[in-house]
Amino acid sequence: MITKIYKLIFSFSVICGFASCSDFFDQESEHVIFTEKDHLHNATDTIYSVIGILNKLQAIGDRTVLLGEVRGDLVDITNTANSDLRDMALFNMGDDNQYNQPRDYYAVINNCNYFIANVDTAMKNNRNEYLFMREYVAVKAIRAWTYLQLVLNYGSVPFVTDPILSKIDAEKEFPRYNLQDICQYFINDLAPLTDRWANEYPNYGNIRTLRNGASRLLFFPVNIVLGDLNLWLASVTGNQSTYREAAMRYYKYISQRNGDNSTYPIGASYYSWMPGSATWDNMYGYISGGDYSSETYGQNTELITVIAGDSIPAEGNYSQLRNLFYSREDNDYHVSIVPSTGMFNLSESQANCCVSSTGTTFYYAPSDLTRHRAGDLRLYWCYDWGQGTNTLTGERYDVSYIDKQSFQNIHIYRRSMIYLRLAEALNGAGFPRAAFSILSTGLNNEILSQEIYPRCSQSDSLWISQIDFPETRYGIITVQEYANQTSTANHNTIGIHTRGSGWTPFNEYYKLPDVEPLFEVDEEGNPIEGSYIYQKDTPELTQRQKEFVDSLLLNENGLELAFEGTRFYDIMRFAYRQPNPGQFLADKVYARRGKANSGAMRGEIKKDLTDQRNWFLQWNGQIGLQ
Protein backbone atom coordinates (compact mmCIF):
# COMPACT_ATOMS: atom_id res chain seq x y z
CA MET A 1 0.00 0.00 0.00
CA ILE A 2 1.32 3.44 -0.93
CA THR A 3 1.22 6.13 1.70
CA LYS A 4 0.89 9.77 0.68
CA ILE A 5 2.87 11.89 3.08
CA TYR A 6 3.74 15.57 2.73
CA LYS A 7 4.52 18.34 0.27
CA LEU A 8 7.63 20.43 0.58
CA ILE A 9 6.73 24.10 0.43
CA PHE A 10 9.82 25.30 2.32
CA SER A 11 9.30 28.47 4.29
CA PHE A 12 12.55 28.95 6.16
CA SER A 13 13.32 30.72 9.40
CA VAL A 14 17.04 31.14 9.89
CA ILE A 15 18.62 31.22 13.32
CA CYS A 16 22.41 31.28 13.60
CA GLY A 17 22.91 29.58 10.27
CA PHE A 18 20.28 26.91 10.86
CA ALA A 19 16.92 26.51 9.13
CA SER A 20 13.73 25.36 10.80
CA CYS A 21 11.52 23.12 8.67
CA SER A 22 8.30 23.57 10.64
CA ASP A 23 6.42 24.85 7.58
CA PHE A 24 8.02 22.54 5.03
CA PHE A 25 5.06 20.23 4.58
CA ASP A 26 1.47 20.21 3.46
CA GLN A 27 -0.30 17.09 4.66
CA GLU A 28 -2.58 17.03 1.62
CA SER A 29 0.28 16.51 -0.81
CA GLU A 30 1.46 13.47 -2.75
CA HIS A 31 5.14 14.34 -2.84
CA VAL A 32 6.45 11.31 -0.98
CA ILE A 33 5.15 8.13 -2.54
CA PHE A 34 6.84 5.26 -0.72
CA THR A 35 5.35 2.33 1.12
CA GLU A 36 4.40 2.57 4.76
CA LYS A 37 6.68 -0.36 5.60
CA ASP A 38 9.92 0.24 7.46
CA HIS A 39 11.96 -1.17 4.60
CA LEU A 40 11.62 -1.63 0.87
CA HIS A 41 11.92 -5.41 0.74
CA ASN A 42 10.63 -6.37 -2.70
CA ALA A 43 11.30 -5.44 -6.29
CA THR A 44 7.85 -3.95 -6.87
CA ASP A 45 8.12 -1.45 -4.02
CA THR A 46 11.74 -0.65 -4.85
CA ILE A 47 11.23 -0.09 -8.56
CA TYR A 48 8.07 1.92 -7.93
CA SER A 49 9.99 4.11 -5.51
CA VAL A 50 12.82 4.76 -7.98
CA ILE A 51 10.34 5.56 -10.75
CA GLY A 52 8.68 7.95 -8.30
CA ILE A 53 11.99 9.76 -7.78
CA LEU A 54 12.51 10.00 -11.53
CA ASN A 55 9.03 11.47 -11.75
CA LYS A 56 9.92 14.15 -9.20
CA LEU A 57 12.99 15.05 -11.27
CA GLN A 58 10.68 16.04 -14.11
CA ALA A 59 9.53 19.08 -12.14
CA ILE A 60 13.04 20.58 -12.14
CA GLY A 61 14.04 19.52 -15.65
CA ASP A 62 13.03 22.62 -17.61
CA ARG A 63 14.37 25.06 -15.04
CA THR A 64 17.72 23.22 -14.94
CA VAL A 65 18.18 24.17 -18.60
CA LEU A 66 16.56 27.61 -18.37
CA LEU A 67 18.42 28.82 -15.28
CA GLY A 68 21.65 27.61 -16.84
CA GLU A 69 21.07 29.21 -20.24
CA VAL A 70 18.81 32.25 -19.98
CA ARG A 71 21.03 34.00 -17.41
CA GLY A 72 24.13 33.55 -19.57
CA ASP A 73 25.40 35.42 -22.60
CA LEU A 74 24.44 33.18 -25.52
CA VAL A 75 20.65 33.59 -25.68
CA ASP A 76 18.23 36.48 -25.57
CA ILE A 77 14.51 36.80 -24.82
CA THR A 78 11.88 37.74 -27.41
CA ASN A 79 8.76 39.84 -26.91
CA THR A 80 6.79 36.59 -26.76
CA ALA A 81 8.51 35.48 -23.54
CA ASN A 82 6.40 35.42 -20.39
CA SER A 83 7.26 37.74 -17.51
CA ASP A 84 8.79 34.94 -15.42
CA LEU A 85 11.27 34.10 -18.17
CA ARG A 86 12.03 37.77 -18.77
CA ASP A 87 12.67 38.31 -15.06
CA MET A 88 15.03 35.33 -15.09
CA ALA A 89 17.05 36.88 -17.92
CA LEU A 90 17.24 40.14 -15.95
CA PHE A 91 18.19 38.50 -12.62
CA ASN A 92 14.96 39.79 -11.08
CA MET A 93 13.12 36.63 -10.05
CA GLY A 94 10.51 37.15 -7.34
CA ASP A 95 9.11 34.67 -4.83
CA ASP A 96 6.15 33.86 -7.09
CA ASN A 97 8.22 33.21 -10.21
CA GLN A 98 7.34 29.75 -11.53
CA TYR A 99 11.04 28.94 -11.95
CA ASN A 100 11.90 29.95 -8.37
CA GLN A 101 10.39 27.03 -6.49
CA PRO A 102 12.94 25.38 -4.16
CA ARG A 103 10.24 23.03 -2.88
CA ASP A 104 10.53 20.99 -6.08
CA TYR A 105 14.22 20.26 -5.43
CA TYR A 106 13.45 19.21 -1.88
CA ALA A 107 10.67 16.94 -3.11
CA VAL A 108 13.34 15.00 -5.00
CA ILE A 109 15.74 15.15 -2.06
CA ASN A 110 13.20 13.98 0.53
CA ASN A 111 12.16 11.04 -1.62
CA CYS A 112 15.83 10.13 -2.07
CA ASN A 113 16.43 10.44 1.68
CA TYR A 114 13.51 8.11 2.40
CA PHE A 115 14.69 5.55 -0.12
CA ILE A 116 18.30 5.62 1.11
CA ALA A 117 17.16 5.21 4.72
CA ASN A 118 14.78 2.33 4.04
CA VAL A 119 15.91 0.23 1.10
CA ASP A 120 17.23 -3.18 2.08
CA THR A 121 20.74 -3.08 0.61
CA ALA A 122 21.75 -6.37 2.27
CA MET A 123 19.16 -8.50 0.48
CA LYS A 124 20.56 -11.00 -2.03
CA ASN A 125 19.04 -13.38 -4.55
CA ASN A 126 19.70 -17.10 -4.87
CA ARG A 127 22.84 -16.30 -6.91
CA ASN A 128 24.23 -14.34 -3.95
CA GLU A 129 23.85 -11.05 -5.85
CA TYR A 130 22.74 -7.88 -4.13
CA LEU A 131 19.22 -7.08 -5.28
CA PHE A 132 18.91 -3.36 -4.68
CA MET A 133 22.42 -1.91 -4.58
CA ARG A 134 22.10 -0.58 -8.13
CA GLU A 135 19.03 1.38 -7.10
CA TYR A 136 20.69 2.54 -3.88
CA VAL A 137 23.72 3.95 -5.71
CA ALA A 138 21.58 5.47 -8.47
CA VAL A 139 19.41 7.28 -5.92
CA LYS A 140 22.47 8.56 -4.05
CA ALA A 141 23.80 9.99 -7.32
CA ILE A 142 20.44 11.64 -8.06
CA ARG A 143 20.40 13.21 -4.59
CA ALA A 144 23.93 14.56 -4.99
CA TRP A 145 23.17 15.98 -8.44
CA THR A 146 19.95 17.60 -7.19
CA TYR A 147 21.69 19.22 -4.22
CA LEU A 148 24.38 20.52 -6.57
CA GLN A 149 21.75 22.16 -8.81
CA LEU A 150 20.04 23.63 -5.75
CA VAL A 151 23.17 25.20 -4.31
CA LEU A 152 24.37 26.45 -7.71
CA ASN A 153 21.14 28.39 -8.01
CA TYR A 154 20.64 29.51 -4.39
CA GLY A 155 24.18 29.70 -3.02
CA SER A 156 23.28 28.61 0.52
CA VAL A 157 20.66 25.96 1.30
CA PRO A 158 19.22 24.04 4.28
CA PHE A 159 20.88 20.64 4.32
CA VAL A 160 18.73 17.61 5.12
CA THR A 161 19.79 13.97 4.74
CA ASP A 162 17.15 12.20 6.84
CA PRO A 163 13.61 11.81 5.52
CA ILE A 164 11.18 14.36 6.92
CA LEU A 165 7.90 12.56 7.51
CA SER A 166 6.19 14.40 10.35
CA LYS A 167 5.66 17.78 11.94
CA ILE A 168 8.15 16.83 14.65
CA ASP A 169 10.78 16.11 11.98
CA ALA A 170 9.96 19.39 10.29
CA GLU A 171 10.47 21.43 13.45
CA LYS A 172 14.10 20.38 13.75
CA GLU A 173 16.80 22.86 12.81
CA PHE A 174 19.06 22.09 9.88
CA PRO A 175 22.43 23.59 8.98
CA ARG A 176 22.88 25.73 5.89
CA TYR A 177 25.42 24.46 3.37
CA ASN A 178 27.21 26.49 0.71
CA LEU A 179 28.69 25.18 -2.55
CA GLN A 180 31.93 24.04 -0.93
CA ASP A 181 30.04 22.22 1.84
CA ILE A 182 27.74 20.44 -0.61
CA CYS A 183 30.61 19.33 -2.83
CA GLN A 184 32.71 18.00 0.04
CA TYR A 185 29.82 16.12 1.64
CA PHE A 186 28.77 14.30 -1.51
CA ILE A 187 32.32 13.55 -2.60
CA ASN A 188 32.69 11.69 0.69
CA ASP A 189 29.25 10.12 0.27
CA LEU A 190 29.70 8.77 -3.26
CA ALA A 191 33.40 7.95 -3.57
CA PRO A 192 33.31 4.72 -1.49
CA LEU A 193 30.67 3.28 -3.82
CA THR A 194 32.57 3.63 -7.07
CA ASP A 195 34.98 0.68 -6.95
CA ARG A 196 32.12 -1.80 -7.19
CA TRP A 197 29.06 0.08 -8.38
CA ALA A 198 30.17 2.99 -10.57
CA ASN A 199 29.06 1.28 -13.78
CA GLU A 200 26.05 -0.65 -12.51
CA TYR A 201 22.63 0.79 -13.32
CA PRO A 202 19.02 -0.26 -12.81
CA ASN A 203 17.60 -1.73 -16.00
CA TYR A 204 13.91 -1.07 -16.42
CA GLY A 205 13.66 -1.94 -20.09
CA ASN A 206 11.67 0.31 -22.40
CA ILE A 207 10.16 3.44 -20.86
CA ARG A 208 8.01 5.45 -23.26
CA THR A 209 10.27 6.96 -25.91
CA LEU A 210 13.41 5.37 -24.45
CA ARG A 211 13.91 2.04 -26.20
CA ASN A 212 16.50 -0.72 -26.55
CA GLY A 213 17.89 -0.42 -23.04
CA ALA A 214 17.80 3.37 -23.09
CA SER A 215 16.26 3.49 -19.60
CA ARG A 216 19.91 3.66 -18.55
CA LEU A 217 19.79 7.25 -19.83
CA LEU A 218 17.53 8.15 -16.89
CA PHE A 219 20.36 7.76 -14.38
CA PHE A 220 23.33 9.93 -13.43
CA PRO A 221 26.70 8.13 -13.66
CA VAL A 222 28.42 8.31 -10.29
CA ASN A 223 31.84 9.12 -11.70
CA ILE A 224 30.44 12.04 -13.72
CA VAL A 225 28.66 13.43 -10.66
CA LEU A 226 31.88 13.02 -8.67
CA GLY A 227 33.79 14.72 -11.47
CA ASP A 228 31.41 17.68 -11.32
CA LEU A 229 31.57 17.91 -7.53
CA ASN A 230 35.36 17.89 -7.58
CA LEU A 231 35.55 20.34 -10.49
CA TRP A 232 33.32 22.85 -8.70
CA LEU A 233 35.18 22.38 -5.43
CA ALA A 234 38.54 22.84 -7.14
CA SER A 235 37.30 25.98 -8.91
CA VAL A 236 36.31 27.50 -5.56
CA THR A 237 39.39 26.42 -3.59
CA GLY A 238 42.06 26.38 -6.32
CA ASN A 239 43.31 23.04 -4.99
CA GLN A 240 45.33 21.23 -7.67
CA SER A 241 44.82 17.78 -6.17
CA THR A 242 41.04 18.29 -6.34
CA TYR A 243 41.35 19.17 -10.03
CA ARG A 244 43.28 15.94 -10.46
CA GLU A 245 40.55 13.97 -8.71
CA ALA A 246 37.98 15.58 -11.02
CA ALA A 247 40.04 14.61 -14.07
CA MET A 248 40.38 11.02 -12.88
CA ARG A 249 36.62 10.75 -12.29
CA TYR A 250 35.83 11.90 -15.83
CA TYR A 251 38.54 9.63 -17.21
CA LYS A 252 37.19 6.65 -15.26
CA TYR A 253 33.74 7.21 -16.68
CA ILE A 254 35.13 7.36 -20.22
CA SER A 255 37.40 4.33 -19.83
CA GLN A 256 34.86 2.17 -17.96
CA ARG A 257 31.54 3.21 -19.50
CA ASN A 258 31.31 0.13 -21.71
CA GLY A 259 33.11 -2.20 -19.30
CA ASP A 260 36.56 -2.34 -17.73
CA ASN A 261 39.27 -1.02 -20.07
CA SER A 262 36.66 -0.29 -22.72
CA THR A 263 36.47 2.45 -25.33
CA TYR A 264 34.28 5.57 -25.40
CA PRO A 265 36.08 7.97 -27.76
CA ILE A 266 34.99 11.51 -28.55
CA GLY A 267 34.06 10.36 -32.05
CA ALA A 268 34.96 11.76 -35.45
CA SER A 269 31.86 13.87 -36.00
CA TYR A 270 32.26 17.36 -37.45
CA TYR A 271 30.67 20.03 -39.63
CA SER A 272 32.95 21.47 -42.30
CA TRP A 273 33.19 23.14 -45.65
CA MET A 274 33.59 20.60 -48.41
CA PRO A 275 37.35 20.06 -48.76
CA GLY A 276 38.76 21.89 -51.75
CA SER A 277 35.60 23.91 -52.29
CA ALA A 278 35.77 27.69 -52.43
CA THR A 279 32.16 28.52 -53.38
CA TRP A 280 31.00 28.68 -49.72
CA ASP A 281 27.68 27.05 -50.37
CA ASN A 282 28.81 23.47 -49.93
CA MET A 283 28.94 22.22 -46.34
CA TYR A 284 29.35 18.71 -45.08
CA GLY A 285 28.24 17.07 -41.86
CA TYR A 286 30.12 13.88 -40.98
CA ILE A 287 28.50 12.07 -38.06
CA SER A 288 30.33 9.12 -36.54
CA GLY A 289 28.80 7.51 -33.46
CA GLY A 290 25.61 9.54 -33.18
CA ASP A 291 24.95 13.07 -32.01
CA TYR A 292 22.91 14.89 -29.39
CA SER A 293 19.62 14.23 -31.18
CA SER A 294 19.75 10.44 -30.82
CA GLU A 295 17.92 9.32 -27.67
CA THR A 296 19.18 5.76 -27.82
CA TYR A 297 21.77 3.90 -25.81
CA GLY A 298 24.73 2.13 -27.33
CA GLN A 299 28.46 1.73 -26.87
CA ASN A 300 29.19 4.74 -29.05
CA THR A 301 26.17 7.00 -28.60
CA GLU A 302 26.52 10.65 -27.58
CA LEU A 303 23.76 11.03 -25.02
CA ILE A 304 24.46 9.96 -21.42
CA THR A 305 21.64 11.24 -19.19
CA VAL A 306 18.16 12.66 -19.75
CA ILE A 307 15.26 13.71 -17.56
CA ALA A 308 12.20 12.16 -19.16
CA GLY A 309 9.38 14.44 -20.25
CA ASP A 310 5.72 13.53 -20.60
CA SER A 311 4.35 13.18 -24.11
CA ILE A 312 1.24 15.36 -23.71
CA PRO A 313 0.73 18.58 -21.70
CA ALA A 314 -2.15 17.11 -19.69
CA GLU A 315 0.19 14.66 -17.97
CA GLY A 316 1.67 17.45 -15.86
CA ASN A 317 5.41 17.16 -16.51
CA TYR A 318 5.44 18.03 -20.18
CA SER A 319 8.65 19.85 -21.03
CA GLN A 320 8.01 23.30 -22.47
CA LEU A 321 11.56 23.71 -23.76
CA ARG A 322 10.59 22.90 -27.35
CA ASN A 323 7.89 25.60 -27.21
CA LEU A 324 10.39 28.13 -25.86
CA PHE A 325 13.26 27.40 -28.27
CA TYR A 326 11.60 26.04 -31.42
CA SER A 327 8.87 27.42 -33.70
CA ARG A 328 6.03 24.92 -33.92
CA GLU A 329 2.28 24.81 -34.17
CA ASP A 330 1.87 24.46 -30.40
CA ASN A 331 3.44 27.91 -29.81
CA ASP A 332 1.90 29.52 -32.90
CA TYR A 333 5.47 29.52 -34.27
CA HIS A 334 6.49 32.26 -31.81
CA VAL A 335 9.52 31.36 -29.68
CA SER A 336 10.65 32.97 -26.44
CA ILE A 337 14.40 32.27 -26.64
CA VAL A 338 16.76 32.99 -29.53
CA PRO A 339 20.55 33.12 -29.97
CA SER A 340 22.03 36.37 -28.72
CA THR A 341 24.41 38.77 -30.41
CA GLY A 342 27.02 37.38 -28.03
CA MET A 343 26.46 33.91 -29.52
CA PHE A 344 26.76 35.20 -33.07
CA ASN A 345 29.93 37.11 -32.19
CA LEU A 346 31.53 34.09 -30.52
CA SER A 347 30.78 31.82 -33.46
CA GLU A 348 31.86 34.32 -36.12
CA SER A 349 35.12 35.14 -34.32
CA GLN A 350 36.54 31.67 -34.99
CA ALA A 351 38.97 31.17 -37.87
CA ASN A 352 37.68 28.24 -39.93
CA CYS A 353 40.65 26.32 -41.32
CA CYS A 354 39.70 24.54 -44.55
CA VAL A 355 41.77 21.86 -46.29
CA SER A 356 42.24 20.94 -49.91
CA SER A 357 40.65 17.81 -51.33
CA THR A 358 43.99 16.02 -50.89
CA GLY A 359 44.53 17.30 -47.36
CA THR A 360 47.93 18.73 -48.26
CA THR A 361 47.21 22.47 -48.15
CA PHE A 362 44.96 24.69 -46.09
CA TYR A 363 43.17 28.03 -46.35
CA TYR A 364 40.59 29.98 -44.34
CA ALA A 365 36.91 30.55 -44.95
CA PRO A 366 35.90 34.21 -45.40
CA SER A 367 34.91 36.02 -42.23
CA ASP A 368 32.03 37.92 -43.83
CA LEU A 369 29.76 35.06 -44.89
CA THR A 370 26.05 35.58 -44.22
CA ARG A 371 23.41 33.48 -42.43
CA HIS A 372 25.80 32.56 -39.62
CA ARG A 373 28.14 30.63 -41.90
CA ALA A 374 31.19 32.67 -40.90
CA GLY A 375 33.52 31.14 -38.35
CA ASP A 376 32.42 28.01 -36.50
CA LEU A 377 29.74 25.97 -38.29
CA ARG A 378 28.10 24.33 -35.27
CA LEU A 379 25.73 27.27 -34.86
CA TYR A 380 24.65 27.01 -38.50
CA TRP A 381 23.92 23.30 -38.10
CA CYS A 382 21.77 23.61 -34.98
CA TYR A 383 19.99 26.91 -35.67
CA ASP A 384 17.82 28.19 -38.48
CA TRP A 385 15.55 31.18 -38.84
CA GLY A 386 13.37 32.93 -41.37
CA GLN A 387 9.77 33.96 -41.89
CA GLY A 388 6.50 32.10 -42.15
CA THR A 389 3.13 33.13 -43.51
CA ASN A 390 -0.27 32.76 -41.90
CA THR A 391 -2.29 30.91 -44.52
CA LEU A 392 -5.54 32.57 -43.40
CA THR A 393 -4.48 36.20 -43.01
CA GLY A 394 -1.34 36.37 -45.14
CA GLU A 395 0.49 37.88 -42.16
CA ARG A 396 4.25 37.33 -42.09
CA TYR A 397 5.94 36.30 -38.86
CA ASP A 398 9.45 35.41 -37.72
CA VAL A 399 10.33 31.78 -37.04
CA SER A 400 13.33 30.41 -35.17
CA TYR A 401 14.52 26.83 -34.80
CA ILE A 402 17.10 25.75 -32.22
CA ASP A 403 17.30 22.03 -32.90
CA LYS A 404 18.95 21.19 -29.59
CA GLN A 405 15.72 21.86 -27.70
CA SER A 406 13.19 20.19 -29.98
CA PHE A 407 12.81 16.97 -27.98
CA GLN A 408 10.34 15.50 -25.52
CA ASN A 409 13.09 14.66 -23.03
CA ILE A 410 15.51 17.03 -21.32
CA HIS A 411 19.16 16.34 -22.11
CA ILE A 412 21.53 16.65 -19.14
CA TYR A 413 24.85 14.93 -19.92
CA ARG A 414 26.49 13.99 -23.21
CA ARG A 415 29.88 12.74 -24.30
CA SER A 416 31.41 15.97 -25.64
CA MET A 417 30.50 17.72 -22.39
CA ILE A 418 32.46 15.13 -20.41
CA TYR A 419 35.53 15.48 -22.64
CA LEU A 420 35.38 19.26 -22.25
CA ARG A 421 35.21 18.92 -18.48
CA LEU A 422 38.08 16.43 -18.55
CA ALA A 423 40.08 19.08 -20.42
CA GLU A 424 39.06 21.74 -17.90
CA ALA A 425 40.10 19.53 -15.00
CA LEU A 426 43.42 18.60 -16.63
CA ASN A 427 44.17 22.27 -17.22
CA GLY A 428 43.52 23.10 -13.58
CA ALA A 429 45.56 20.06 -12.57
CA GLY A 430 48.64 21.56 -14.23
CA PHE A 431 48.50 19.89 -17.66
CA PRO A 432 47.50 22.61 -20.14
CA ARG A 433 49.17 20.75 -23.02
CA ALA A 434 46.95 17.72 -22.45
CA ALA A 435 43.89 19.95 -22.14
CA PHE A 436 44.80 21.77 -25.35
CA SER A 437 45.25 18.47 -27.16
CA ILE A 438 41.63 17.54 -26.40
CA LEU A 439 40.63 20.74 -28.19
CA SER A 440 43.14 20.63 -31.03
CA THR A 441 44.16 17.13 -32.11
CA GLY A 442 42.44 14.77 -29.72
CA LEU A 443 44.23 12.98 -26.89
CA ASN A 444 45.69 9.49 -26.93
CA ASN A 445 48.82 7.74 -25.71
CA GLU A 446 50.83 8.82 -28.73
CA ILE A 447 50.12 12.49 -27.99
CA LEU A 448 50.86 11.92 -24.31
CA SER A 449 54.20 10.28 -25.11
CA GLN A 450 55.29 12.85 -27.68
CA GLU A 451 53.90 16.11 -26.30
CA ILE A 452 53.22 15.73 -22.58
CA TYR A 453 55.59 13.33 -20.80
CA PRO A 454 58.86 14.87 -22.10
CA ARG A 455 57.90 18.28 -20.73
CA CYS A 456 56.67 17.14 -17.31
CA SER A 457 58.48 16.49 -14.09
CA GLN A 458 58.83 12.84 -13.12
CA SER A 459 56.02 13.05 -10.55
CA ASP A 460 53.67 14.78 -12.99
CA SER A 461 54.46 12.22 -15.70
CA LEU A 462 53.71 9.44 -13.23
CA TRP A 463 50.34 10.94 -12.37
CA ILE A 464 49.13 11.61 -15.90
CA SER A 465 50.31 8.20 -17.07
CA GLN A 466 47.18 6.87 -15.31
CA ILE A 467 45.25 8.27 -18.27
CA ASP A 468 45.45 5.52 -20.85
CA PHE A 469 44.03 6.06 -24.34
CA PRO A 470 45.77 3.40 -26.48
CA GLU A 471 46.21 4.33 -30.14
CA THR A 472 44.72 0.98 -31.15
CA ARG A 473 41.42 2.00 -29.55
CA TYR A 474 41.66 5.81 -29.62
CA GLY A 475 43.16 6.49 -33.02
CA ILE A 476 43.29 10.11 -34.17
CA ILE A 477 41.84 10.68 -37.62
CA THR A 478 44.30 11.92 -40.22
CA VAL A 479 43.94 15.03 -42.32
CA GLN A 480 43.50 12.82 -45.39
CA GLU A 481 40.58 11.05 -43.71
CA TYR A 482 39.14 14.44 -42.80
CA ALA A 483 39.47 15.60 -46.40
CA ASN A 484 37.80 12.42 -47.67
CA GLN A 485 35.05 12.45 -44.99
CA THR A 486 35.97 8.95 -43.88
CA SER A 487 37.68 7.27 -40.97
CA THR A 488 39.04 3.78 -40.37
CA ALA A 489 37.55 1.58 -37.68
CA ASN A 490 39.78 2.68 -34.82
CA HIS A 491 40.28 6.28 -35.97
CA ASN A 492 37.62 7.73 -33.72
CA THR A 493 39.27 10.70 -32.01
CA ILE A 494 39.30 14.32 -33.11
CA GLY A 495 40.00 17.68 -31.54
CA ILE A 496 36.72 19.16 -30.27
CA HIS A 497 37.42 22.50 -31.97
CA THR A 498 37.61 20.65 -35.29
CA ARG A 499 33.96 19.69 -34.84
CA GLY A 500 33.01 23.12 -36.20
CA SER A 501 36.05 25.29 -36.98
CA GLY A 502 37.88 23.29 -39.59
CA TRP A 503 41.07 21.25 -39.31
CA THR A 504 42.44 22.71 -36.08
CA PRO A 505 45.95 21.14 -36.18
CA PHE A 506 46.67 23.35 -39.23
CA ASN A 507 45.04 26.47 -37.76
CA GLU A 508 47.67 29.19 -37.29
CA TYR A 509 45.29 31.17 -35.07
CA TYR A 510 44.79 28.31 -32.62
CA LYS A 511 48.21 27.63 -31.13
CA LEU A 512 49.37 27.09 -27.57
CA PRO A 513 51.89 29.66 -26.25
CA ASP A 514 55.28 27.99 -26.25
CA VAL A 515 59.02 28.60 -26.13
CA GLU A 516 61.11 28.79 -29.27
CA PRO A 517 61.96 25.24 -30.42
CA LEU A 518 65.48 23.94 -29.96
CA PHE A 519 67.27 21.52 -32.27
CA GLU A 520 70.54 19.66 -32.12
CA VAL A 521 73.09 21.27 -34.43
CA ASP A 522 75.80 19.93 -36.67
CA GLU A 523 79.48 20.93 -36.54
CA GLU A 524 78.69 24.11 -38.45
CA GLY A 525 75.93 25.11 -36.07
CA ASN A 526 73.05 24.28 -38.39
CA PRO A 527 69.91 22.65 -36.92
CA ILE A 528 69.71 18.94 -37.66
CA GLU A 529 66.36 18.00 -39.19
CA GLY A 530 64.23 15.82 -36.91
CA SER A 531 66.42 16.48 -33.84
CA TYR A 532 63.90 18.48 -31.82
CA ILE A 533 64.99 18.90 -28.18
CA TYR A 534 62.14 18.76 -25.68
CA GLN A 535 62.41 21.39 -22.97
CA LYS A 536 60.82 21.03 -19.57
CA ASP A 537 58.00 23.49 -19.06
CA THR A 538 58.77 26.19 -16.51
CA PRO A 539 56.16 27.17 -13.90
CA GLU A 540 55.84 30.54 -15.62
CA LEU A 541 55.12 28.97 -19.02
CA THR A 542 52.68 26.47 -17.54
CA GLN A 543 50.76 29.26 -15.83
CA ARG A 544 50.61 31.28 -19.05
CA GLN A 545 49.40 28.23 -20.93
CA LYS A 546 46.78 27.46 -18.27
CA GLU A 547 45.29 30.94 -18.54
CA PHE A 548 45.27 30.73 -22.33
CA VAL A 549 43.65 27.28 -22.39
CA ASP A 550 41.10 28.34 -19.78
CA SER A 551 39.89 31.09 -22.12
CA LEU A 552 39.76 28.63 -25.02
CA LEU A 553 37.78 26.17 -22.93
CA LEU A 554 35.11 28.69 -21.96
CA ASN A 555 34.74 29.62 -25.62
CA GLU A 556 34.62 25.98 -26.67
CA ASN A 557 31.95 25.25 -24.08
CA GLY A 558 29.90 27.98 -25.74
CA LEU A 559 30.53 26.72 -29.27
CA GLU A 560 29.83 23.07 -28.48
CA LEU A 561 27.21 23.27 -25.72
CA ALA A 562 25.26 26.43 -26.58
CA PHE A 563 21.52 26.26 -25.77
CA GLU A 564 21.93 23.08 -23.68
CA GLY A 565 21.55 24.72 -20.27
CA THR A 566 25.12 24.94 -18.99
CA ARG A 567 26.33 28.39 -20.02
CA PHE A 568 25.66 30.44 -16.88
CA TYR A 569 27.03 27.68 -14.68
CA ASP A 570 30.13 27.45 -16.88
CA ILE A 571 30.72 31.20 -16.64
CA MET A 572 30.28 31.01 -12.87
CA ARG A 573 32.73 28.12 -12.52
CA PHE A 574 35.36 29.82 -14.69
CA ALA A 575 34.77 33.09 -12.80
CA TYR A 576 35.72 31.49 -9.49
CA ARG A 577 39.21 30.94 -10.89
CA GLN A 578 39.75 34.61 -11.75
CA PRO A 579 41.36 37.30 -9.56
CA ASN A 580 38.05 39.20 -9.63
CA PRO A 581 35.23 36.64 -10.06
CA GLY A 582 32.42 39.19 -9.91
CA GLN A 583 33.85 41.41 -12.62
CA PHE A 584 34.60 38.42 -14.85
CA LEU A 585 31.03 37.09 -14.71
CA ALA A 586 29.48 40.54 -15.02
CA ASP A 587 31.52 41.36 -18.13
CA LYS A 588 30.41 38.12 -19.79
CA VAL A 589 26.70 38.47 -19.02
CA TYR A 590 26.50 42.19 -19.78
CA ALA A 591 27.99 41.45 -23.24
CA ARG A 592 24.94 39.33 -24.12
CA ARG A 593 24.02 41.83 -26.87
CA GLY A 594 27.62 42.55 -27.81
CA LYS A 595 30.37 44.34 -25.92
CA ALA A 596 29.36 47.67 -27.45
CA ASN A 597 25.96 47.31 -25.76
CA SER A 598 27.25 46.18 -22.37
CA GLY A 599 26.29 49.46 -20.72
CA ALA A 600 22.71 49.23 -21.94
CA MET A 601 22.50 45.59 -20.87
CA ARG A 602 23.86 46.50 -17.44
CA GLY A 603 21.15 49.13 -17.12
CA GLU A 604 18.43 46.72 -18.17
CA ILE A 605 19.54 44.01 -15.75
CA LYS A 606 19.93 46.57 -12.96
CA LYS A 607 21.46 44.00 -10.59
CA ASP A 608 25.16 44.54 -9.93
CA LEU A 609 26.60 41.22 -11.04
CA THR A 610 30.04 42.13 -9.74
CA ASP A 611 28.47 41.33 -6.34
CA GLN A 612 28.44 37.53 -6.10
CA ARG A 613 25.29 37.59 -3.96
CA ASN A 614 23.38 38.72 -7.04
CA TRP A 615 24.36 35.60 -8.96
CA PHE A 616 21.94 33.56 -6.86
CA LEU A 617 18.21 33.32 -6.36
CA GLN A 618 16.45 34.03 -3.10
CA TRP A 619 13.05 32.81 -2.03
CA ASN A 620 10.79 34.34 0.57
CA GLY A 621 13.82 36.02 2.13
CA GLN A 622 14.82 32.68 3.64
CA ILE A 623 16.91 30.72 1.13
CA GLY A 624 19.87 32.05 -0.82
CA LEU A 625 22.86 34.18 0.05
CA GLN A 626 21.98 37.04 2.38
What do these predicted ranges mean?
Residues 151-158, 232-239, 430:
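Short coil/turn linking the two alpha-helices of tandem helical-hairpin repeats
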Residues 21-70, 593-626:
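Membrane-proximal, proline-rich intrinsically disordered regions
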Residues 1-31:
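Bacterial Sec-dependent N-terminal signal peptides
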Residues 36, 64-77, 199-220, 224, ...:
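Short, surface-exposed recognition loops and adjoining beta-strand edges that mediate ligand/DNA contacts
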Residues 343-415, 461:
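Flexible, polar/acidic helix-loop-strand segments at domain edges
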